[in-house]
A protein has these predicted regions:
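Alpha-helical scaffold segments that form or flank carboxylate-/histidine-based iron centers
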Residues: 2-13, 35-53, 91-95, 119-133
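Alpha-helical bundle segments that constitute or directly flank the non-heme di-iron/ferroxidase center
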Residues: 2-33, 88-116
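Arginine residue identity/basic-tract feature
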Residues: 27, 60, 67, 120-122
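Carboxylate-rich helix-loop segments that flank metal/cofactor sites and access channels
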Residues: 57-96, 100
């Protein structure tokens, strides 16, 4: 499949954002204090790496088959923090940072879905966008349980 100039530029943009997200989640997994959050960030880093691979395939003109449904099973969280602490402040910062990134990437996919002429590509991008929205929901759930989201 050949891409026009605009489609190529958008794929390059998406690839850069997915790489940034994967790297950020990996680093944040190392920095997080709560083991639940470390696990969540590690899981999200893996999923962002999968998104990066999908976008790389698209760049090469290969339209991958997407699995039906959304991401993996929804994680559940228990409160790790009661009251304020430096650890909670750090984990809150890491969550806020990644949640802002998910919002940005989701908006980028929202734009891209309408810019590609091939319906199969739009379906792939839409699938990834749904997973990005799930990531945001998981971050919100963790923050909410720990009194970090107001």
């Amino acid at each position: 499949m050949q891409w026009n100039q605009k489609e190529s530029a958008l794929l390059k943009d998406l690839k850069g954002q997915e790489q940034l997200c994967a790297n950020k989640y990996s680093r944040h997994a190392d920095a997080a204090k709560d083991p639940q959050l470390k696990q969540l960030f590690s899981q999200l880093a893996q999923q962002e790496a999968e998104h990066l691979n999908t976008i790389t395939e698209l760049e090469r003109g290969i339209i991958p088959q997407m699995q039906s449904g959304g991401s993996k099973s929804q994680p559940t969280f228990t409160a790790a923090y009661h009251g304020e602490s430096q650890e909670k402040q750090l984990d809150c910062f890491l969550c806020s940072d990644t949640l802002a990134g998910e919002k940005h990437v989701s908006q980028l996919y929202d734009t891209c879905v309408f810019e590609f002429s091939d319906a199969r590509v739009r379906n792939v991008l839409n699938h990834i966008q749904k997973e990005e929205q799930e990531h945001g929901k998981w971050l919100y759930d963790y923050m909410s349980v720990n009194g970090m989201y107001q």
